[in-house]
């Protein structure tokens, strides 16, 4: 039987060398695979690591794509602090966006931007309800949350694929799996820069992310609720009697 014994002291050198070595090996074997597939490894390296940062509009598009991922990461940070291994964030993100998007399609003529805040709340509710399934199975039946949350990702992917090809499909999509267009009030405006104009698709959502990061840090480290989450993860048995 294999047993794992934690070290008494963690090597300071390996805390630095470990991540660097992991990145190097990942890049090396990745380039090796691309080489076997017939691609130029140097061109592959450029396209993956340098090309996205070669133009300002490409950098802005990276920031746009990072916005929802950062929100998901903050949510997972709370889970991991509580020692809950939720790896179904992708499915929860899908169901949250599906619920928020479906709600927006119910009001095709709304123009006020306050509507976006309502969509955000509904999106959080949709993701939370999807996460509630592995949570209730874990707390009531002691079902492994890793397996359940992972399997629900594929359920969510298939479900949204069905929805955009069925109930939410735009009759004018010419057979493509596209939803009906959203109203002006359901779309986040792009940021205009003086003398430059718009930088790709960069929108005001990035400002929300900039505010959300320090707020999340303050919540986890400076509030009673954050302290409870930390205690739950560090000492779950003690947390039951708290």
Map each language-model feature to its residues.
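Membrane-interface starts of transmembrane alpha-helices
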Residues: 10-25, 92, 111-123, 144-148, ...
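Hydrophobic core segments of alpha-helical transmembrane domains in multi-pass membrane transport
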Residues: 19-35, 72-76, 97, 101-103, ...
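Transmembrane helix-bundle core of multi-pass membrane transporters
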Residues: 149, 153-222
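Single transmembrane alpha-helix segments in multi-pass membrane proteins
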Residues: 33-37, 53-107, 120, 124-132, ...
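Membrane-interfacial amphipathic/re-entrant helices at transmembrane-helix boundaries
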Residues: 2-71, 113, 118
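A cytosolic-side transmembrane-helix exit/cap motif
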Residues: 63, 110-113, 138-143, 165-175
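Membrane-helix/interface signature in polytopic inner-membrane proteins
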Residues: 215-242
């Amino acid at each position: 039987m294999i047993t794992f014994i934690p070290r008494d002291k963690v090597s300071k050198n390996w805390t630095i060398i470990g991540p660097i070595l992991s990145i190097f090996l990942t890049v090396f074997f990745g380039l090796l695979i691309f080489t076997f597939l017939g691609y130029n490894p140097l061109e592959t390296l450029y396209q993956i690591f340098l090309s996205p940062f070669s133009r300002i509009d490409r950098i802005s598009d990276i920031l746009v794509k990072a916005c929802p991922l950062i929100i998901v990461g903050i949510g997972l940070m709370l889970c991991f602090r509580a020692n809950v291994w939720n790896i179904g964030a992708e499915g929860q993100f899908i169901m949250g966006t599906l619920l928020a998007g479906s709600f927006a399609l119910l009001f095709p003529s709304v123009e006020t931007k306050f509507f976006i805040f309502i969509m955000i709340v509904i999106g959080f509710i949709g993701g939370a309800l999807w996460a509630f399934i592995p949570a209730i199975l874990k707390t009531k039946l002691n079902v492994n949350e890793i397996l359940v949350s992972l399997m629900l990702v594929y359920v969510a992917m298939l479900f949204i694929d069905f929805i955009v090809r069925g109930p939410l499909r735009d009759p004018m999509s010419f057979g493509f799996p596209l939803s009906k267009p959203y109203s002006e009030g359901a779309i986040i405006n792009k940021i205009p820069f003086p003398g430059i104009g718009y930088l790709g698709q960069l929108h005001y959502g990035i400002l929300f992310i900039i505010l959300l990061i320090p707020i999340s840090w303050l919540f986890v480290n400076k509030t009673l609720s954050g302290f409870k989450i930390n205690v739950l993860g560090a000492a779950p048995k003690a947390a039951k009697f708290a």
